[in-house]
């Protein structure tokens, strides 16, 4: 049995940090030690920021984004084209698309993908909210921006089937060769998708 080398408060900090995606037990220990060493500059402000987030963060009732207001900043922005909705799996995907700055539209966060093997069905995702938004009218295009996984594609097909009779344009992101990518390094699935989604130049 391993000996304890620190108090329960620090052990708890390490255990909680280890639950953050991307941090295992070893990385969590390093992060905890760094925070403790920089107690005034990092640990205190981080604890305060986390408390504020716990008190103030809300899930947008319209799109599923996280913010401190409801509806969120994206939904409340009247400069956006609210007739186009980009459908994403997770909030991190919404943020990634916003960083790219390619579109100035509305979003809808599903909260995951359909996965029968994991017991995730349509009722477990924010699909009903999407159907309600589209059914209310004023939407001309839905851009399905889910990951190119089996679950992502199954989710895209399910949404397309559910909304096919509403007379809106439904598109999805192109899949294929990334900018700066070399063909020799791409897998067969990516190359096949790129060939099928080829465009005229």
UniProtKB/Swiss-Prot annotation:
GO biological process, one term: DNA repair
Pfam family, one: RecR_HhH
Domain Toprim: 83-178
GO molecular function, one term: zinc ion binding
ZnF C4-type: positions: 60-75
Record-linked PROSITE patterns: RECR, TOPRIM
InterPro entries, per the entry: DNA_Rcmb_RecR, Rcmb_RecR, Rcmb_RecR_Znf, TOPRIM_dom, TOPRIM_RecR
SUPFAM superfamilies, alphabetized: Recombination protein RecR (SSF111304)
Top-level lineage group: Bacteria
Signal peptide: none
Keywords carried by this UniProt record: DNA damage, DNA recombination, DNA repair, Metal-binding, Zinc, Zinc-finger
Function: May play a role in DNA repair. It seems to be involved in an RecBC-independent recombinational process of DNA repair. It may act with RecF and RecO.
Family membership noted in the UniProt record: Belongs to the RecR family.
Protein name in the entry: Recombination protein RecR
Organism, scientific name: Agrobacterium fabrum (strain C58 / ATCC 33970)
Encoding gene (name): recR
